[in-house]
From Swiss-Prot:
The keyword Metal-binding applies. GO terms for molecular function: metal ion binding. Belongs to the metallothionein superfamily. Type 4 family. Pfam families: Metallothio_6 (PF05522). Metallothioneins have a high content of cysteine residues that bind various heavy metals. This is Metallothionein-B. Keywords: Metal-binding, Metal-thiolate cluster. The keyword Iron does not apply. It comes from the Eukaryota.
Length: 67
């Protein structure tokens, strides 16, 4: 894996492609210059139920979800 390897990570319920692999564990890839957020969170590192607002009905199954 080179420096241009991408993985899909989640922050604030959004998917974002970014370089490296740690973001897939920490769920923080939407920092400035890191990547562009796009779409709903569906990656294994941070998976939330559809429409999750982090309330009583929130089901965040894996990772550091910040719905």
């Amino acid at each position: 894996p080179g420096p241009d390897v991408k993985c899909v990570c989640c922050q604030d319920g959004e998917e974002c492609p970014c370089k490296g692999g740690e973001c897939c564990i920490t769920g923080t890839c939407c920092k400035e210059g890191d990547g562009l957020c796009c779409g709903k969170c569906s990656n294994a590192a941070c998976k939330c139920a559809d429409g999750c607002k982090c309330g009583s009905g929130c089901s965040c199954t894996l990772g550091n979800c910040t719905c």
